Amino acid sequence: MTVLLDANVLIALVVAEHVHHDAAADWLMASDTGFATCPMTQGSLVRFLVRSGQSAAAARDVVSAVQCTSRHEFWPDALSFAGVEVAGVVGHRQVTDAYLAQLARSHDGQLATLDSGLAHLHGDVAVLIPTTT
């Protein structure tokens, strides 16, 4: 089963200085499944890297490098928000979470996250990566 990485997991994997880099990397290395990204999570990574001082071209190259890994699968954003399960969504920060969870469901996959609230709300597809902090 392929696991869609939410933006925080993707960023933690790419940025060695991230507080959860080791936890995310250890989790991914211990897993033998494939992982997926989508335009929404890739865009979040690019935005984070540019905000951190990298050029847009360098950030795009990071996304390309992620996509070139053998376990990577790209999931296009092919869902309408009209079909997204929104039960439990009470704030604007949960809208993207609901979309990513629905995208994972549509691919018979899972959604990896560092967010315990997301994991609780979407327990049918979410995988909470354990951290020490």
From Swiss-Prot:
It comes from the Bacteria. Inhibited by EDTA. This is Ribonuclease VapC29. Keywords: Hydrolase, Magnesium, Metal-binding, Nuclease, Toxin-antitoxin system. Toxic component of a type II toxin-antitoxin (TA) system. Its cognate antitoxin is VapB29. Has ribonuclease activity. Its EC number is 3.1.-.-. Its cofactor is Mg(2+). Belongs to the PINc/VapC protein family. The lineage of its organism: Bacteria, Bacillati, Actinomycetota, Actinomycetes, Mycobacteriales. GO terms for molecular function: magnesium ion binding; RNA nuclease activity. GO terms for biological process: negative regulation of growth. Mg(2+) binds at residues 6, 97. It is an enzyme of class 3 (hydrolase).
